[in-house]
A protein has these predicted regions:
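Asp-based, Mg2+/Mn2+-dependent phosphohydrolase catalytic module
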Residues: 1-6, 108-112, 128-262
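N-terminal helical cap/lid subdomain that shapes the substrate entry/recognition surface
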Residues: 3-108, 112-117, 133
Length: 262
């Protein structure tokens, strides 16, 4: 019997909006610098997709960052530091989020086609409800509005890689089986969230946090450079357990057609 996909659950920043996932990245970098530690882009992006306060905890647990912290403060970082950093981070992010809610290329077209097939649109995020109030409003003004969204606030702060936000989507959308759900994201924690939920977990390359480039930077690359970077991101997603990897949202509906025809 042919499979029928009932719902596609998208991530937000780096997946459906905010090409390159720059809003949170910029804020994390600035916060750590303010506290006297300059992180690399790799260190900032590695935990992307997690609940934002967990992201700060994860960065502080990285060997090099912790070493820099102890050199500056003569002690290890603690939870009080995490809370102070998060307060600064949240204020920074909330002040710029409205500038990072434009839908990525092919997103609106892909969502329209999904809806024409009767497929429901869900979403999960590493943002909090407070942050999402801004993002969802601006995204809707720009033409993107999923049927539902859930943040870690809705699952007792057990965000990615826990699967619970996916399950909340399924419950709200009245989906009958995890076998009929596709999760699409742009980070390793997105992939793990999908796998832990038992749904089909898809990575998207262009405009992803994993790729880490603005649209202008990406388009300025030669085809060979694009191919090389995309291959690296594809490998990262597959090694994390992705069921498939798409270049951009223009490939999503074709993937779903193939899944349903198996």
């Amino acid at each position: 019997m042919d499979r029928k996909i009932e719902a596609v659950i998208f991530d937000w920043a780096g997946t459906t909006v905010d090409y390159g996932c720059f809003a949170p990245v910029q804020a994390f970098s600035e916060v750590f610098k303010e506290f006297g530690v300059t992180p690399t882009m790799e260190e900032v992006r590695k935990p992307m997709g997690m609940l934002k306060i967990d992201h700060i905890r994860t960065m502080l647990s990285m060997d090099r960052i912790q070493q820099c912290w102890q050199e500056k403060y003569d002690r290890p970082s603690n939870e009080e530091d995490v809370q102070k950093m998060y307060a600064v981070y949240e204020a920074k992010l909330l002040s710029v989020l409205d500038q990072y809610a434009d839908p990525k290329p092919y997103v609106l077209e892909a969502v329209k086609e999904l809806r024409l097939k009767g497929i429901k649109i869900g979403s999960t995020t590493g943002y909090t409800d407070k942050m999402m109030t801004i993002v969802t409003k601006c995204a809707e003004e720009n033409g993107y509005r999923p049927d539902v969204w859930f943040s870690p606030d809705s699952v007792e702060l057990k965000g990615r890689p826990y699967p619970y936000m996916v399950f909340k989507n399924m419950q709200e959308l009245e989906v009958t089986s995890v076998a009929n759900v596709v999760k699409v994201g742009d980070t390793i924690s997105d992939i793990k969230e999908g796998k832990n939920a038992g749904v089909l977990s898809i990575g998207v390359i262009e405009g992803s946090s994993e790729l880490g480039l603005s649209e202008e930077e990406y388009e300025a690359l030669s085809q060979d450079e694009k191919d090389s970077l995309c291959k690296k991101v594809r490998t990262s997603f597959l090694e994390a357990g992705a069921d498939a990897v798409i270049l951009n949202m223009s490939e999503l509906n074709e993937y779903i057609r193939k899944v349903e025809a198996r």
